[in-house]
A protein has these predicted regions:
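Asp-box/BNR beta-propeller blade signature and adjacent active/binding-site loops
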Residues: 1-369
Length: 369
């Protein structure tokens, strides 16, 4: 196990760094992204997107480069940056501005440069026939490419009526979850079905992870603020529609925090897919005042393994015992696993001290606690 701090709070003119993403391209380049936050580091402060690249499987990293700057878009943050690794080597990306505009860009050189952004918000307006969203966000984390070539990423949306951010700012609650997808390599995007609703049984479903199962179905693992304090699971035959009723997974605790989900390239000895899930595996309230949206301490970041299509998670190991929040997972060319995550805290739980990347192998994970 090796841990490296990639972005340190209070450096390079930013207050802190949050919402990390990580991806291994088809050509083996590792890309690590963060929201570089100004102001007080809140969701609505001025955020840029920074990227670091690794050409040796996550051992060493090139200096940060700013790939999206919020001040070129007007007031509001740039956020929820999502990367996709295309089998042809292309890197696709989606991100949001001010939680009401969505943009697409791409890289053909492993993230060394990106195309000019193209706004795709118009495609997402189709959701308004069912839900009058005023706030919308992609991911975060990474999107996926299905074996048939389709690009899929979950999105969450809100009517903005929540008051949690104060006067003049749209709320992120109540919220709903859907997917968007592209069948032409990111050129155009389509709306999937809205499949997780704030309906009283489920409370404020939001940041969602997608993975392709052994038989080609797509599973979504959903954050929510439901009192069951468990992750929600829904499955679709194609990542777009016919979603199953979301059900709580008793094995996966929900402290109200984004998680991460990854299918490894190589199956196990029986030919079954190997899946990893990471999130703060904790329901204590030593660091977080109880009662706020049922949130619990973001600590004890753990990685779990499944070999039966995410049905059970018999293997689990703590990666970071202390404060640790949002994360994302990738697999390096040599099979090493990379987990990028929010590490440590300063003034409050969401004032992240650093964004770090941990590098480990299956043997470390299988060894357990």
């Amino acid at each position: 196990m090796q841990k490296t701090d990639l972005f340190m709070a209070r450096t390079e003119g930013y207050w802190n760094y949050r919402v990390p993403g990580i991806l291994c391209t088809a050509n083996g380049v590792i890309l690590a992204t963060v929201e570089a936050r100004t102001g007080a580091g809140g969701d609505w402060d001025g955020n840029d997107i920074l990227l670091r690249r690794s050409l040796d499987g996550g051992i060493s990293w090139q200096p940060p480069q700013r790939i999206v700057a919020h001040d070129t878009y007007g007031p509001g943050p740039v956020s929820n940056f999502v990367l996709f690794a295309d089998a042809d080597g292309t890197v696709h990306a989606l991100y949001c501005h001010a939680y009401n505009r969505v943009f697409y860009l791409a890289s053909g050189d492993g993230g060394a440069s990106f195309s000019p952004p193209v706004e795709v918000t118009g495609a997402l307006n189709a959701f308004r026939a069912e839900y009058p969203w005023r706030v919308i966000a992609t991911g975060p984390g990474h999107g996926i490419q299905l074996r048939g070539g389709r690009l899929v990423v979950p999105v969450w949306m809100s009517d903005g009526s929540g008051t949690e951010f104060g006067a003049g700012k749209l709320g992120h609650r109540p919220s709903e979850v859907a997917t968007i997808y592209s069948d032409d390599g990111g050129t155009t995007w389509q709306c999937g079905e809205i499949f997780a609703h704030s309906d009283g049984q489920i409370i404020n479903p939001s940041e969602t992870l997608a993975v392709e199962l052994d038989d080609g179905r797509v599973l979504c693992n959903i954050r929510s603020e439901s009192p069951q304090n468990r992750r929600l699971i829904s499955v679709s035959p194609d990542g777009a529609g016919q979603w199953s009723k979301p059900l709580f997974d008793e094995a996966l605790l929900e402290p109200v925090c984004m998680g991460s989900l990854l299918r490894l390239r190589q199956p196990n000895a029986e030919g079954r897919g190997v899946y990893l899930f990471a999130n703060p595996d904790n329901l204590e309230n030593e660091l977080t005042p109880p009662g706020r949206n049922l949130a619990h301490d973001r600590k004890r970041l753990s990685v779990k393994m499944s070999v039966n299509d995410c049905t059970t998670w018999p293997i689990s190991r703590v990666l970071e015992a202390g404060p640790s929040g949002y994360s994302d997972l990738a697999e390096a060319p040599d099979g090493s696993i990379l987990c990028i995550y929010e590490r440590g805290m300063l003034n409050r739980m969401t004032d992240t001290a650093s964004v770090a990347v941990a590098r480990f192998d299956r043997a470390w994970l299988s060894a357990g606690e």
